[in-house]
């Protein structure tokens, strides 16, 4: 018995007890580590759907005996385990004497209290055999069943699951009825207009009503689909003409803001368009062409948008470059004066911008500054009952810090200023203060302070410096008509001007006191400001090619008959009422070619267009359009480009010849006069001599014989030269040659000078070529 016992050990009940103690790992002698805290079931907004899909058992870290946190997926050693990872209390192993049958050893320790076993979690979203599919028009319902909720946690339970499901899935418990929840991946801050979208012509005056009101009629999105700018109320994308791929424009897509109603949205957008359209005939204003309907596409949602001139960059992007500090001061002064000329043009036309900042100043490829974004602009004139007109005072927080003056910052609700300090203010002086802060930022390459209020320490320092300069150096600094030097290098915000007169202009514009602040009239009367030379003249023609409009909208066809009754030609059919280029350069003003003109349809066709279209017509419309519309070939595009280049070269040659033949100084005039006196015998009538023996006229005849220009151009050149010489000979010998009429200037010019070739510019800034220039950074 003893040998048999040694070969086959007897497994008594005491041995089973010893084995069970071994499994427990000396729990009697060493205290076990505290169990891991059960994770809370409530999910925060910071969690993503990836966090939610994990089960509670695999996501809970297992506490170890030695207190070291282990990896959730790693299995601890048997001796180190103090509690089963499944959370089920281990069943005590009984002695074999107490087991009635062998099946007692096959009990599953993973079953729950109800005696059922939870199904294993799966990663797919489809329903299992035990689940019922719930219909969802946006896809399969990803909400788990009650069985899965017991395993994954109460965050998937039926009570309150709508607030925890990720925004990417559409749940039946989600009470959000805003369609933008599905159009913008759950971002319900961007709201869409309800259908149908209103016709823009219903909100526009008769003189600027449009024939085409749909974006897709004549424009298409750029293939790169880049958002070149975005804000709280709009986003800007690039669109191209459907007829000339090289004609690129900017689409400013307008969005609804806050709790704005559709009616308020339409009025706000139409007001901005009317103001921008009214100011589009100036070289320092970004041209705005059309107000169109924008359809829902993969790029953007439905709404309204502006077709605008596309700028190269804005002034803020220019100043944030690392090499901006190396740009010469005279170029910075040039850019500042261009911005000031744009602001003055707005004020002269009765409009206050009210949101001037470097981000709202665009630059063309030629280096011309252009104001943009008239979203909060307004007409500042107010007509009283007695017929007098005065400036309309504003109230409320308007503009962007730090470009908003102190009198505006008092209206900021976050600052909690007393109501006694909140007084109405002049919107024109708001623009002047913003212009002064832009000038200081332009020179110092830093924003002087964050907010123009006494709660900002930098502004308090600037205000103290302002008062100290007046108290100790220039007591008459704020007096009107005083042009003494301004602050010098001892003041931080005047140090980099390196010119006391320039710092005077900047500080007078940015005067914290609106009563003594520079106005636009004071600025343009300042001697230093008048001496600043710019590379562009304010009277130069705006060189912007207007888009071609060849396709009309069904809503705008009735306007074709009304267009003939208006004395002002519509700018939508290729005529430029602003003095700029036509959509087709071959068209004279007030005429339309057969390519761009809109034929007046018959009344029967108009009635048919207003009938609802069937689904068959909608499906067949692309095939009908492809069969009737000829494709635009490369030969036609090349021919159009050659014709345009030939016309440009012809006009440029005429301007160059005219510039060479006109005397540019009094010395040339005397030389021409001496030659006339030597070749004529009649000394009584000087005008007759100049007419009969003018060598310039002979030169013009030779040019005509060689065929370089037309005879009419030569005759006009000769007549102008004769008149100039007659006046110079009969008058003083040092009399300057009068400048040409701005209305007769040529609209063709090079990239370095936007003026005409016949008039020499004061200064030419080659922004694209000068080393260290702003455009070479």
Curated annotation (Swiss-Prot):
Residues 30-41, 149-172, 677-694 have a biased composition (Low complexity). Its EC number is 2.7.11.1. Gene3D superfamilies: Transferase(Phosphotransferase) domain 1. Pfam families: Pkinase (PF00069). It catalyses: L-seryl-[protein] + ATP = O-phospho-L-seryl-[protein] + ADP + H(+); L-threonyl-[protein] + ATP = O-phospho-L-threonyl-[protein] + ADP + H(+). Residues 222-529 form the Protein kinase domain. PANTHER family: OVARIAN-SPECIFIC SERINE/THREONINE-PROTEIN KINASE LOK-RELATED, SERINE_THREONINE-PROTEIN KINASE CHK2. Belongs to the protein kinase superfamily. Ser/Thr protein kinase family. This is Serine/threonine-protein kinase PTK2.
């Amino acid at each position: 018995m003893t040998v048999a016992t040694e070969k086959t050990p007897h497994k008594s009940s005491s041995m089973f007890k010893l084995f069970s103690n071994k499994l427990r790992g000396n729990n009697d002698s060493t205290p076990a580590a505290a169990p891991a805290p059960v994770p809370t079931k409530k999910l925060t907004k910071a969690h993503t759907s990836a966090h939610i899909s994990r089960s509670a058992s695999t996501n809970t870290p297992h506490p170890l005996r030695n207190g070291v946190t282990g990896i959730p997926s790693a299995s601890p050693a048997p001796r180190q385990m103090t509690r089963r990872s499944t959370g089920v209390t281990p069943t005590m192993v009984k002695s074999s004497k107490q087991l009635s049958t062998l099946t007692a050893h096959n009990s599953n320790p993973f079953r729950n209290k109800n005696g059922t076993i939870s199904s294993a979690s799966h990663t797919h979203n489809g329903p299992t055999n035990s689940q019922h599919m719930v219909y969802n028009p946006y896809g399969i319902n990803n909400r788990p069943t009650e069985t899965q909720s017991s395993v994954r946690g109460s965050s998937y339970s039926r009570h309150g699951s709508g607030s925890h499901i990720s925004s990417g899935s559409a749940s039946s418990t989600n009470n959000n009825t805003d369609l933008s929840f599905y159009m913008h991946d759950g971002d319900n801050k961007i709201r869409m207009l309800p259908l149908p979208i209103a016709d823009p012509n219903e909100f526009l005056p008769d003189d600027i009503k449009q024939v085409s009101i749909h974006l897709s009629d004549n424009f298409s999105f750029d293939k790169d689909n880049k958002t070149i700018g975005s804000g709280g109320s709009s986003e800007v994308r690039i669109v191209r003409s459907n007829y000339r791929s090289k004609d690129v424009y900017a689409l400013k897509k307008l969005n609804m803001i806050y709790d704005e109603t559709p009616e308020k949205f339409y009025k706000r957008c139409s007001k901005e368009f009317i103001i921008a359209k009214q100011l589009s005939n100036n070289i320092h204003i970004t041209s705005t062409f059309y107000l169109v309907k924008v359809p829902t596409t993969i790029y953007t949602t439905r709404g309204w948008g502006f077709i605008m001139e596309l700028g190269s960059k804005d002034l803020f992007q220019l100043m944030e470059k690392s090499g901006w500090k190396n740009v010469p001061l005279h170029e910075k002064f040039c850019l500042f004066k261009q911005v000031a000329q744009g602001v003055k043009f707005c004020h002269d036309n009765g409009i206050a911008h009210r949101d001037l900042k470097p981000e709202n100043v665009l630059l063309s490829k030629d280096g011309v500054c252009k104001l943009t974004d008239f979203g909060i602009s307004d007409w500042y004139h107010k007509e009283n009952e007695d017929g007098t007109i005065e400036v309309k005072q504003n109230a409320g927080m308007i503009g962007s810090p730090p470009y908003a003056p102190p009198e505006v910052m008092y209206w900021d609700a976050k600052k909690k200023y007393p109501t006694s300090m909140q007084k109405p203010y002049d919107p024109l002086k708001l623009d002047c203060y913003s212009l002064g802060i832009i000038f200081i930022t332009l020179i110092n390459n830093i924003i002087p302070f964050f907010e123009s209020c006494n709660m900002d320490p930098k502004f308090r320092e600037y205000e103290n410096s302002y008062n100290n300069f007046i108290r100790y150096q220039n007591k008459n600094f704020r007096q009107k008509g005083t042009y003494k030097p301004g602050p010098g290098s001892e003041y931080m915000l005047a140090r980099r001007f390196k010119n006391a007169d320039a710092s005077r202009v900047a500080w007078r514009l940015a005067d914290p006191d609106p009563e003594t602040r520079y106005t636009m009239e004071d600025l343009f009367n300042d001697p230093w400001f008048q001496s600043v030379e710019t590379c562009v003249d304010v009277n130069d023609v705006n060189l912007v090619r207007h888009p071609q409009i060849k396709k009309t909208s069904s809503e705008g066809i009735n306007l074709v008959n009304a267009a003939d009754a208006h004395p002002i030609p519509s700018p939508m059919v290729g005529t430029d009422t602003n003095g700029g280029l036509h959509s087709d350069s071959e068209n004279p003003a007030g005429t339309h070619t057969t390519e761009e003109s809109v034929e007046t349809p018959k009344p029967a066709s108009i009635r048919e267009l207003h009938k609802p279209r069937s689904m068959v017509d909608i499906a067949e419309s692309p095939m009908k359009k492809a069969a009737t519309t000829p494709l635009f070939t490369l030969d036609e595009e090349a021919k159009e480009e050659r014709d345009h280049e030939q016309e440009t070269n012809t006009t440029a040659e005429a301007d160059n010849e005219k510039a060479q033949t006109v005397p540019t100084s009094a010395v040339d005039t005397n030389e021409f006069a001496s030659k006339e006196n030597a070749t004529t015998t009649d000394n009584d009538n000087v005008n007759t001599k100049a007419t009969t023996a003018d060598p310039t006229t002979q030169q013009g005849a030779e040019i005509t014989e060689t065929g370089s220009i037309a005879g009419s151009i030569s005759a006009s050149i000769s007549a102008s030269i004769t008149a100039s010489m007659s006046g110079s000979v009969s008058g003083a010998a040092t009399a300057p040659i009068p400048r040409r009429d701005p209305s007769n200037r040529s609209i063709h010019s090079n990239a370095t000078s936007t003026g005409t070739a016949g008039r020499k510019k004061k200064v030419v800034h080659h922004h694209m070529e000068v080393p260290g220039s702003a455009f070479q950074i």
